[in-house]
Amino acid sequence: MSLLLCAASLEGVEPVALFDGKTLSGWKPSAMPEYWSVKEDAIVGKSDAQKKGSILWTEAAYDDFVLEAEFRYEGHVDSGFFLRNENEQIQIGISGSLKRDMTCSPYIGKKGKYPVEAVGVKDLLKIGEWNRIKISVKGKKYIGTLNGKQVLDYTTDMEPAKGPIGLQVHPNVLMEIHFRALKITPL
């Protein structure tokens, strides 16, 4: 039912590219700009021996939207998509606190916890290959799909507010993650 509602609200609305495949135009890092680059049509977030954190934020802010992207990583990665603020994130990779993969699960930074866990991710996630993620954010409702299968249906108790989208390089982790085909459809 929730996927039908999301599809109905997208009729006639074209997605907008968040990344041109060549530059970081439209994005700004919170810190450590050297952690962010473009390589082979992808945004690359890569930490160094300092293992400091950085978030690459869109310059534009969004209310309700559908975010679509592809991501790829190998090894230990603790990353994700920040949605409208730094308190709500959809995880990619190993949770630092839980020490296991929590890809597609929401993390609430202000509360320091995962309120729910995405289902079926282990069977869908392809480590070292490109994975497709789609996150619908409408009011307090989050719906997530991984490689075409719905894995998350979550309602937050946080008040929604307009804000940017962020890509994360988590502190205290030596990691590299690639993002491409980033697009957003305002709802």
Where do the PLM segments sit?
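Bacterial N-terminal signal peptides
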Residues: 1-7
